[in-house]
Amino acid sequence: FLPFIAGVAAKFLPKIFCAISKKC
């Protein structure tokens, strides 16, 4: 369960951070 969440976070967090901070 945790490895799955870590994988999803690793995939989506950079995109969310990029959209929020406007730093890509």
From Swiss-Prot:
Belongs to the frog skin active peptide (FSAP) family. Brevinin subfamily. Expressed by the skin glands. It is found in: Secreted. It holds the Pfam family Antimicrobial_1. One of its GO terms (cellular component) is extracellular region. Disulfide bonds join 18-24. This is Brevinin-1Bc. Antibacterial activity against Gram-positive bacterium S.aureus.
